[in-house]
């Protein structure tokens, strides 16, 4: 048990999927895992452990934003021995060739700042995904016929951004999408020698202003969860 996670020793699997929304964690566990058991509900941040194709898996919420994810990922790694951490979540597309419902596999993550920025001083650390997970996820997506894009994303530390100039530069430099967690996850994985990947479903588009209706968001996210699970155990 830690300050923020009430799971007992052994309750957390070495492979952890991390959606931002705790209710999405519950949905994913009940939909894709066999015999899921709730192992955490401290502060309403739900976590479940079960099995997928005979492999133990934990699906645990991270909350919104890098500071929240940093708390849970740190504790999952240092106190519970998590070895593989895969963020599953939504993203806003930033390129015309990326459409709603597409999946983005984040190879690298740009950011202005993360909770870890202070330890690097003048160094601009470049967080990246684990190559083995990335390669396996692309193969799994291809086998499913899911339209997938591999490349850089932007992890923002604000949701209501008031800097259109920054968005313009991200688009100009080919950034595929924006979200709020992956850069810190990749940084923590690098620090602790763990594997990390972000598998993201496009729910909104910054250029067209299209968005998935809320009723469809859950059903459209199934491919993302399956890709993450298949990549974790490839």
Swiss-Prot record:
It catalyses: a purine D-ribonucleoside + phosphate = a purine nucleobase + alpha-D-ribose 1-phosphate; a purine 2'-deoxy-D-ribonucleoside + phosphate = a purine nucleobase + 2-deoxy-alpha-D-ribose 1-phosphate. Coiled coil: none annotated. One of its GO terms (biological process) is purine nucleoside catabolic process. The gene is deoD. This is Purine nucleoside phosphorylase DeoD-type. Its EC number is 2.4.2.1. Phosphate binds at residues 20, 24, 43, 87-90. The record marks 217 as: Important for catalytic activity.
